[in-house]
Amino acid sequence: MVSRSGCVRSKPLPEQSRRVDRIKLNMSDKATAFDFSKGIALHRMGEKLAGPYFKWQFSQVAPYVGRRVADVGCGLGNMTEFLLDRDIYLGIDTCEEFIEILQTNHNRASNVKTIIADVLDDSFPTILQKNDIDTILSFNLLEHLEDDRRAAVNLVKSLPRRGYLLLLVPATPCIYGALDRWDGHFRRYTKQTMRNLFAALPVQIEKLHYFNCIGALGWWMKGRCAPSPEHSEYDYKLMNLCIPVLSRLERIISPPIGLSIVTIARVI
C-alpha cells in the first residue's frame, strides 16, 4: 500500500484493528495488498485535483519555513513545488520508487536533492546535520510509524538550535476508520498526545492547532458509514469548493476538532 512513509503499508495496532472489526469493515487482508501502480495512479489523480488543498496545508506552516528544508516522508512531492525557492530542498523517503519519480519531476532544479533514508535509523540525524538543514517539514508521516516517539527524538536531534520542526498529522481518534486502516495508520492524534510525544525533548511548541474541521466529518462518513479505500474525484472537488470559505473561517476561529493537527516546534 502506498503511503507517505514508504511503499509498503504497516498494520494498525491491535487495539485499532479491534476497533475497525467492531465497525464491521468489509475489507480483508487481501483487499489491502500492495498495488504500487494503482497507488501511483490514485496519487496522480489526487495531485491534479488536490492542488488547492496542498496549498492550504502548506499555508499553515509557511511563515516558519527556513532556507534549507528537509521534507521527511516526502512521498511523490506534494509539498515540493512550494519549496523550490529555498536554498536547498531535501526530499527524504524510504521508498526508492517515490524518490526516483521526485527526482525525475525536478531534475532541472539544482537545489532539489533526494535521499533514501529512514527516520527511525540512528544515523538519520547525521544525514540532516551534514546538509545544514534549518527546517524539517513532515506531513502525514508519524501516524505510519509504530515507534513515533523514536521518530520524534531523531527529528529533534537533526535540527540545530532555533531550527523549526513543522508537522501535520491526522487528528481526532474517534474518526479512525476504513481510510486509516487502508493507509496503514497506527493512530490519529490529539493536542495532548502531540504534547506528550515531545515531552522532555529540547523543543518549544510555539503553535498547536486543529486543521480542516469539515474534513473530519467527511473522513468519518467515508471511513465509517460507507467504508471505501479510495478518494473519488467528487471528494476532491467538494473539498476544493469548501476551501475558500473554510480557510477564512479557521483563521478567525480555531476549530475544536479537525482532520489534522498542525504542530510548530522550535529547538531550544
Regions found by a protein language model. Give the residues of each.
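Cationic, low-complexity basic patches in intrinsically disordered or flexible, solvent-exposed regions
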Residues: 12, 16-17, 25
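Conserved N-terminal segment of class I S-adenosyl-L-methionine
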Residues: 23-131, 135-139, 149-152, 232, ...
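S-adenosyl-L-methionine-dependent methyltransferase catalytic module, highlighting the catalytic core
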Residues: 36-37, 41-56, 64, 78, ...
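A short His-aromatic
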Residues: 140-144
